């Protein structure tokens, strides 16, 4: 894992002790409203929010809903003269839209005033969900690094290793390329009489988040990020879509074309699939002894190939928040050393680098040992004003190929002009 060190003094500045009672006056007679996604990190915040409520004599209202509903619910509030939400959690591919629309407040003056050192964060996450064009608008909250979730009990079994050697003529090692991985996943499903893959092909976000891994793995991208000309007509894009389509047809669980990440988690929890190219944040669900059959049987491996997809969420203050000082106190508290560490131990996905070197954390979540490598070999969607439209456009391409059976090369070639239009005149890409 790449080392991201910060001085102890800097760490204590960011991660200081609980606020004094005097500081709590800024939240007096105020409630904090936050809209969040139904994921383990939201649960981790909910489990400790009473500490802030007690220290600041206030109430934190967390409204947790399905991701697909969040954007449409946030936009009317953010567009109003006075909004309902005091704190925002911003998905990485909303960053460009929210910044361009002026919906999130710049934090640099507050950071300087309170001597907050953002150097404790993994740099890639700070660039993805922290700064935009050199100014800070967010503090990274949690990431959704992706890679291969797999059944270690099956893959490590001598019988599997022997069968693999007989099939492929070599000793077992984790595949080095996406093409090799796809062949192994198809073979393993037949070998074990299971689904080789658990997949999420639902439009728009699930299939795009999943398939973007395939695109990045084979060296493709949506654009040449120097010229901002679309590269979706290149051979790499067709290769990625073809591999994805092949696995969806020949290795995935029934109904995968309409599945989301909850369905992937359920397929894995029920012990019905060997592999998934999916989110690390699913592990707390897979470790839930109440309804998972794969407790302590799953492990994580970085995606084979060149790069994987990296997404993240950041804490932000709405520009129309009624009490920005109280909102800022919440951001400082929730990203304090104590709160961030408690969230991590509770199954959250930490953004502060020091946590990944903590022995207690790694003992509780051993699959997180390879997160540093995964983050260092990943990238996010471009920070652009029309990133939501980018996702919709790629989802349209994938739907045409996966559902309608169109040839990927032709569909992708036709999409190039659509992708080019999305970046035309974008102020964030100058």
Task: Please annotate each region the language model reported.
Residues 1-32, 111, 420-430:
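Short, low-complexity disordered leader/linker segments with a strong preference
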Residues 22-33, 53-54, 134-135, 186-193, ...:
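Immediate post-signal peptide segment of exported/extracytoplasmic ligand-binding proteins
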Residues 26, 92-147, 179, 210, ...:
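Hinge/lid segment of periplasmic solute-binding proteins
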Residues 27, 31, 37, 295-296, ...:
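Long, aromatic- and glycine/proline-rich binding clefts that accommodate carbohydrate-like moieties
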Residues 29, 108-121, 162-174, 197, ...:
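Short, solvent-exposed loop/beta-turn-alpha elements that line the ligand-binding surface or hinge
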Residues 47-122, 131, 135-138, 158-159, ...:
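Extracytoplasmic "Venus flytrap"/periplasmic binding protein-like
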Residues 54, 79, 134, 154, ...:
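Extracytoplasmic/periplasmic substrate-recognition and gating elements
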Residues 180-188, 220, 225-258:
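Glycine-centered hinge/linker elements that transmit conformational signals in sensory
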